[in-house]
């Protein structure tokens, strides 16, 4: 679960995570904070590793007391079929959590053939996290296909 105030920008290749592929966004990311009063600040390498990429960042000094969510988690799956014209669609499911409980959820749809989102999340941060998660998901999928 990534911090809901984290705005990921690019993959972080040297994050020193034991199992980077298991991180909430599919790998480690560098980026900026979007917490009120800290917009555009660049977290340290340690903050990225301990808070931003992991969510439930109660130890982070930037985390506002009043917030809608504590973390956001994602999952993806390929859906659709050729008969109804939805082949190549990927559903990215998100769950926003507060105090370890669901506080909002939904599904974002990506058309892999047209390389575009069918619908976008109302919150730019969640949308960007979904884009990063999808990028990591597709890279893992390509690697698995190449290995078989």
Task: Label every PLM stretch briefly.
Residues 1-148:
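Cysteine-centered metal-binding/redox modules
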């Amino acid at each position: 679960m990534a911090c809901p105030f984290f705005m990921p920008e690019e993959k972080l290749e040297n994050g020193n995570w034991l199992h980077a592929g298991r991180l909430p966004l599919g790998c480690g990311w560098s980026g900026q904070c979007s917490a009120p009063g800290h917009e555009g600040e660049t977290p340290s390498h340690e903050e990225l590793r301990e808070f931003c990429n992991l969510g439930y960042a109660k130890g982070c000094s930037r985390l506002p007391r009043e917030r809608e969510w504590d973390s956001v988690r994602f999952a993806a799956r390929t859906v659709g079929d050729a008969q109804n014209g939805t082949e190549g669609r990927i559903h990215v499911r998100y769950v926003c959590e507060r105090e370890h409980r669901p506080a909002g959820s939904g599904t974002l749809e990506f058309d892999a053939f047209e390389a575009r989102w069918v619908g976008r999340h109302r919150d730019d941060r969640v949308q960007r996290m979904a884009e990063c998660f999808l990028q990591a998901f597709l890279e893992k999928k390509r690697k698995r296909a190449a290995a078989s």
